[in-house]
Amino acid sequence: MIQHSIFKHIFKILLSLLATMSIAAHAQYKTLDPNDQNDPDAPRFWEEAEIKIPTAPPSKDLKPFYVSAITQLKFALDAPSITFGKDEVIRYVLVITTPSGGQQVSYEGIRCEKYEWRLYATMQKDGEWHKSVNSRWQLIRGAGHNSYHAAMVKDAFCDNSIPRRSAKEIIPLLKP
């Protein structure tokens, strides 16, 4: 009889944990009716968190990563800029360098769950950041010699469709 009550107690604890995990998994999703937020069966939609465009140029802590054997461009992430939103979006500053030394600096986000990326802003020659006019989520394309988004997602940012949780976890996975 004692064993039965212990198993019953453990079962209740496991059910509570599963319910909590389910609610946490839906945290970045909102319900149409705020009163339904704790209802696991309520229809939900994803909502992107408010973003802040960087105010400074990239740091000197650039982490290069491999994209393709046939690209002439060099790609690097500004390590201190990598952030993890409650909306499950990984945001970062990317620096692309041409063979002649020219650079393109952008602030972007990757959404592992949907295999999408978004350009938020670019840094101009004067060092000022300018918001992207047509910023929208786009599917990541894996083909092409400059498909750096696919390289970041496959090698470092995502574990299948689940985003990694820290820059310390991502940086070692970048293939230089």
PLM region descriptions:
Residues 16-18:
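Classic N-terminal secretory signal peptides
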Residues 2-14:
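Bacterial N-terminal signal peptides that target proteins for export
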Residues 20-24:
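N-terminal signal peptide c-region/cleavage motif recognized by signal peptidases
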Residues 28-176:
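N-terminal secretory-pathway/extracellular module detecting exported/lumenal segments
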